[in-house]
Amino acid sequence: MKTAILTLSTLALLSTTTFAETKPNIPAKEASQIFKAAGFSKTKHGWEGSCDTGEITTYKDLNGDSLKDAVISDYSTMCYGNTGVGYHIVAQQKTGNWKLIFENMGIPTFLKTKGKDGWPDIENGGPGFCFAVYRWNGQQYKVHRYEYQGKACTLN
């Protein structure tokens, strides 16, 4: 019993310190534009979307066009079921404006494979064992294939 408690305590400590992700440093004006492009509104609790308060979890160039892109995550089992998370991908345009290009429920994993214009394929993770992989076709992200741990699978 003592070993189990010690192990759990150690894991809790490691997950909150060593492996903690740092939030991206985004200028306030830029963050405001990103949230607004995704349809979020500023409230006293933060930036709220149709489900819950969101946070920018990724802020970098995702497709190699030298412009920043952002991923906003929000969390709600009421909206997103067992997965509990949704995401919104916002891309900076050449004009400097931001545009929502994709949103979905699930946990996005950006893969090395790419669609049109250098946009990475997105594995849409969550509970289960076979996940949709979305590919950018120049207009939108659409389901391209299904895979689990890098191998093809089917939903049958």
Predicted regions and their residues:
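Acidic, small-residue rich beta-repeat scaffolds with periodic aromatic anchors
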Residues: A4-I5, A20-Q33, F110-N156
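Sec-dependent N-terminal signal peptides
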Residues: A4-L14
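Terminal domain-start segments
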Residues: T18-K60, T154-N156
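Short consensus segments that form the blades of beta-propeller domains
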Residues: W47-E48, T77-N82
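Beta-propeller blade termini
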Residues: D52-G64, G106-D121
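Acidic/hydrophobic-patterned starts of short beta strands in beta-sheet-rich repeat architectures
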Residues: L62-Y75, I89, K116-G125
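Short, solvent-exposed loop/turn segments at conserved positions within beta-propeller repeat blades
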Residues: Y80-V85, P127
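Short, surface-exposed beta-strand/strand-loop-strand elements in extracellular ectodomains
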Residues: V85-A91
